[in-house]
Amino acid sequence: MSFTVKVKEELLGLGTKSKSELAAIMKMSGSLGIASQGLTLSITTENAKIARHIYELLLSFYQVKSDIRHHQKTNLRKNRVYTVFLDEKVEDILSDLHLADAFFGIQEGIDPLILSDDEASRAYLRGAFLSNGSMRDPESGKYQLEIVSVYLDHAQGLASLMQRFLLDAKTIERKKGAVTYLQRAEDIMDFLIVVGAMEAMAEFEAVKILRETRNDLNRANNAETANIARTVTASMKTINNIVKIMETSGLENLPIDLQEVAHLRVNHPDYSIQQLADSLSKPLTKSGVNHRLRKINKIADEL
């Protein structure tokens, strides 16, 4: 089983139900048709469990029973495609999810209501990854998570959602669409936290640490003392930078996530990165804490 499939199965197992998640799946994998009775909706996926999930979301929110169909593609290893087909209440569903404009080509981005709400943003990113997301196996040592969109506007909207959670998301246009991607291991782990894939995040971090340990084995024998010295030096440097920010622009002007880390660092200068991570109001990896401390240092350097 690929790591991408593991992540998607964990997300499906969360049992969450969100219209924002459904909106992302419909926008990225849905298509409209016209029949005598009105509009029809077809949502395609190569994952049977995702098809069932879509069926359950439609039933739960709109009390409609869709059809799950499948057909075979030729000359492909993964050649079964599932289609969730619906021919009732389609116009009402599109209107409720604010998708009608997007389907007719007027609006290609993401609903501003989703962009402005944390929980809706998390759910939308979860749906986007379920629909068109993939990531490299951390065993490869090459870290990349990407989500493919048809339109650049939508890819940029996904990047904005990720940046809302301090992820360094970028976009690129390719022949078959636009891609929103993350390349830093810390950002990928934080993304997994954002969408709720905690087990996958823990496995990713464990594999990453194991690889780093193997690669650094020759240096590890004499690293303990040096690491302690570096930790103390880094802690004092960060504290000095936090004081600098407090005396100039003020900590209250930092993003909430950075404010919390800054207060912890100043109040507990002896804390290790792991202790800082454990003390945060929301779970975060050691790498994620380091990522935020680097951002604080960068802000101070620019003052």
Swiss-Prot record:
Domain of life: Bacteria
Family matches, as PANTHER family: CELL DIVISION PROTEIN WHIA-RELATED
Classification via InterPro entries: Homing_endonucl, Sporu_reg_WhiA_N_dom, Sporulation_regulator_WhiA, Sporulation_regulator_WhiA_C, WhiA_LAGLIDADG_dom
Gene3D superfamilies membership: Homing endonucleases
Cell division recorded as keyword: yes
DNA-binding region positions on the chain: 272-303
Gene: whiA
Annotated keywords: Cell cycle, Cell division, DNA-binding
Alphabetized SUPFAM superfamilies for the sequence: Homing endonucleases (SSF55608)
GO molecular function: DNA binding
Single Gene Ontology BP annotation: regulation of sporulation
Function, as annotated: Involved in cell division and chromosome segregation.
Family per similarity comment: Belongs to the WhiA family.
Protein name, per record: Probable cell division protein WhiA
Keyword hit for Cell cycle: yes
Pfam families per record: HTH_WhiA, LAGLIDADG_WhiA, WhiA_N
